[in-house]
Each structure stands twice: as structure tokens, then as C-alpha cells.
Regions:
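Small-side-chain structural scaffolding
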Residues: 2, 70, 139-142
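Histidine-centered active-site/metal-ligand motif
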Residues: 3, 37-39, 93
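Short, solvent-exposed loop/turn segments at secondary-structure junctions
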Residues: 5-7, 40, 58-59, 124-126
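Conserved beta-sheet core of the metallophosphoesterase superfamily
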Residues: 12-77
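Accessory, non-catalytic peripheral segments of nucleic-acid enzymes
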Residues: 76-167
């Protein structure tokens, strides 16, 4: 067990470790190395053993979107381990206006309730409609609701699209 940096393992979805221990050096000393330094869960099997990064037990930020988080149970006799997914902690989700407007069901609402949400306004919508939509999203009680207008088309009151967000 350790809190190691091991070369070529991922810190997260975007960055790989260039420094630290070499896998071969650790596996020369042990058949199983378990580390918790990186937040990204990753397992590698080699001819002479395994290296396991357990990762965080819960999502930390929007970089963890679509990452399965949880914990491991280790059998000290056999060195076998089993991952258990954390289904209790809040998650981070990104939603786009265009996705909500074309959704055929309301499954997206589960992504909002009790979670951290980044909402992208990626198409034209009136000020009144965006206000109504944000009120509706807020009623689902997200832990955090951040709105990103970066890619929006300018809002125009006269371009009333008449979207129905009543649920």
C-alpha cells in the first residue's frame, strides 16, 4: 500500500504522470501494489503482478463526469479485491439546453436532483424562457447550478420560442 506517483498512470482524464516510480520496480518487490495518490481509478495487470489506483470514493469536480467512483474490499489472504460503486454521493453533470429541448423522456431530471450541474445555453432562447427553465431546474434541488452562457446566441425578447418547461 502507498501514496505513490507511478509513471504512465493517469492523474485524471486529461493528465498522465511522467515522474515517480516505474511499474517494474514496484512489481519486483510485490505481486500487488495499491495506491491512492491519484483521484482517477485505474488498474493494470502485468505478467508479474497488478497495480491498482483506488481513486476517490466520490466525484470531486466536473473533471470526474462519467467516472465510476467507489471503494474496494481486499481479501488479505488471496489478494483478490472487489470494487463497489458509490451510488450515494452527489455527482457532477453537464447539461445543454439543446439536449433538454429534444429529450424524449425526463431521465435528465435525475442528473439534476441532488447533484452538481453545469448548464450550457447553446442555442437561442428568450430571456423569459431561460428564466422559466432555470426556475424549473432549481425546483429539482441541485446542490449547485452553474449556467454557462459562453456559446449562447444573443437573447432576444421579440424572438419568443414558446418552449413549455412546465414539466
Amino acid at each position: 500500500f502507498g501514496h505513490f506517483e507511478i509513471q504512465s498512470f493517469k492523474f485524471n482524464h486529461y493528465k498522465v504522470c511522467d515522474d515517480g516510480f516505474k511499474s517494474a520496480d514496484l512489481l519486483d518487490k510485490s505481486k500487488l501494489t495499491i495506491s491512492g495518490h491519484f483521484h482517477h481509478r485505474e488498474e493494470r495487470k502485468y505478467e508479474n503482478g497488478k497495480i491498482l489506483y483506488v481513486g476517490n470514493p466520490f466525484q470531486m469536480d466536473f473533471g470526474d463526469i462519467n467516472s465510476s467512483k467507489g471503494y474496494y474490499i481486499l481479501d488479505f489472504e488471496t489478494l483478490e479485491y472487489e470494487f463497489t460503486q458509490n451510488k450515494k454521493s452527489p455527482e457532477h453533470h453537464k447539461l445543454k439546453l439543446s439536449e433538454l429541448l429534444t429529450a424524449k423522456d425526463k431521465k435528465w431530471q435525475k442528473k439534476v436532483a441532488g447533484n452538481f450541474v453545469k448548464f450550457y445555453v447553446d442555442q437561442q432562447i428568450t430571456n423569459d424562457d431561460i428564466d422559466a427553465l432555470l426556475q424549473m431546474l432549481s425546483k429539482l434541488k441541485p446542490l449547485s447550478l452553474n449556467v454557462d452562457y459562453t456559446n449562447r446566441i444573443d437573447f432576444k425578447v421579440e424572438d419568443d420560442t414558446g418552449y413549455d418547461f412546465s414539466g
